[in-house]
């Protein structure tokens, strides 16, 4: 009986000795392996969210502004539902609106000042009207800060100080200090937006000849104003043109009558 007990104890000790490397590997796996990224990471470009061993958890930093359509808007809603404490900034703008062009530049700067907030922007023509109605968008630009419990719309002035205070009041976060790399990246984005503005201004003279349907859809006010000016011009010119035509026919009629009288 004692021999059997000793044999069982020896077998248990050998098994424990063989399992020690596996247990050690399992203990270190939580620190040395990065977790699998969620599906939203395919839409939101992030920096590495795998912390070093012994470091506390921190919020992921989102790089830049994600431009998208209805599908990306749905991804933003999914991100809010997955991270209930995190905020998402959503900007609705219109390419024909000059205020939207200025606001886009400030929105890009805000994404650098508040990197822990995911920033999404949506152009009017890429979003279905029912989605704009769902969010109550009646003018451009329109900015929201959204999380799982609230949706706050910005109503203040379009200055950076006012926007930063709005972010701080709603989220409780302070703007971060930017390093040289972040400033350089932000400057590059601002230059790209400025170049786009110059290109749009250069092409605006040929917009009507190139695509009048697009002009009517995106620049409705400009199209109506142009139509009004043309109608007023026609109302001014048509009476004078009619009088000139009548005078020409009258002169031709008198000339023909004189020729007939000479022949007779």
UniProtKB/Swiss-Prot annotation:
Q: Which residues are glycosylated?
A: 147
Q: InterPro entries this protein is in?
A: APRL4/6, Thioredoxin-like_sf, Thioredoxin_domain
Q: Name one GO cellular component term.
A: membrane
Q: Where is the signal peptide?
A: 1-29
Against PROSITE patterns, the record matches this protein to: THIOREDOXIN_2
Compartments annotated for it: namely: Membrane
Q: Indicate how the chain sits in the lipid bilayer.
A: Single-pass membrane protein
Q: What is its main location?
A: membrane
- Tell me the domain of life: Eukaryota
The UniProt keywords, alphabetically, are: Glycoprotein, Membrane, Signal, Transmembrane, Transmembrane helix
Q: Where are the transmembrane segments?
A: 221-241
- Thioredoxin domain: residues covered: 51-172
Protein name, please?
A: 5'-adenylylsulfate reductase-like 4
Q: What is the lineage of its organism?
A: Eukaryota, Viridiplantae, Streptophyta, Embryophyta, Tracheophyta
